[in-house]
Amino acid sequence: MAAGYRAEDDYDYLFKVVLIGDSGVGKSNLLSRFTRNEFSLESKSTIGVEFATRSLQVDGKVVKAQIWDTAGQERYRAITSAYYRGAVGALLVYDVTRHSTFENVERWLKELRDHTDPNIVVMLVGNKSDLRHLVAVQTDEGKAFAERESLYFMETSALESTNVENAFAEVLTQIYRIVSKRSVEAGDDAGSGPGKGEKINIKDDVSAVKKGGCCSG
């Protein structure tokens, strides 16, 4: 195969990442900004579930992200189990201009951990950082919650494309590092690890990026 050429579906790893958080916090625009570099001011609530994909290079490997998005309204809770199944990363999103969306982050995190391995790679995202004059959730508040729960943290603006790439890339990089570390520890010189293009379900290996481990609540 010629160096430098890769077909669209030629990837080394496939990671499922879910977007969670209240309705209206900008999950769909984060998804469209990252996967298509698009933003819609007239965003309608997502009906049911949609997902988009994008591939990134991480340490010379092609990592394909399958990113799932659903509306945050309670009436969609019936799809919860299928939505979370197999997810190895999550962006937990709140709107920095609406404090109630930040208050609900704890409930979303509990739901996430109820349906996935508790060591899933999670990035707490304070979106709409471009609306500086309307900020209701201070950066320190988000940072403190993230540190308490061993989450990663970034503030983003899907509108201005601020930190959107960084947030997704950080989650994918951390997942990849856990997977590659596991392969090295298992003596994966003979190619006994996951096959090319295989979807990875990290389970307990994600604990490698946690600072203080995880306690059962």
UniProtKB/Swiss-Prot annotation:
InterPro entries: P-loop_NTPase, Rab_GTPases_membrane_traffic, Small_GTP-bd, Small_GTPase. It is a lipid-anchor. Signal peptide: none annotated. Its main location: membrane. One of its GO terms (cellular component) is endomembrane system. Keywords: Cell membrane, GTP-binding, Lipoprotein, Membrane, Nucleotide-binding, Prenylation. One of its GO terms (molecular function) is GTPase activity. Belongs to the small GTPase superfamily. Rab family. NCBIfam families: small_GTP. This is Ras-related protein RIC2. It comes from Oryza sativa subsp. japonica (Rice). The gene is RIC2.
